Amino acid sequence: MPSRPEWVGSCNCSICRRLGTLFAYYPAEAGIRIEGETARYVWGDRMISLHHCPTCGCPTHWEPIVEGIDKVGINARLLDGFAIDGPRYLLNGDELEVRYLDNAG
């Protein structure tokens, strides 16, 4: 992770709702590196690929597969130091803003 995210997104699209992910967003050019192999699922509208661990199935990140999307998402729930403190979300003890995203269409 290149830096602490400013916020994490709680998306209400069909797959994020079901998986319970909270994504930390970074610019596509941020140089995010994922260690180890992942399996991928190409989401319904074929704009992003959602990656998950082939062993345990945890969603790890998503990345764009079309031009024009300038960010990537990392599953914040997998970050060391990430905790949920009641209605607050924390990363290494510091509060993170959660924005509720209406992407259900």
What is the predicted function of each stretch?
Residues M1-G105:
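A short Gly-Trp-Pro
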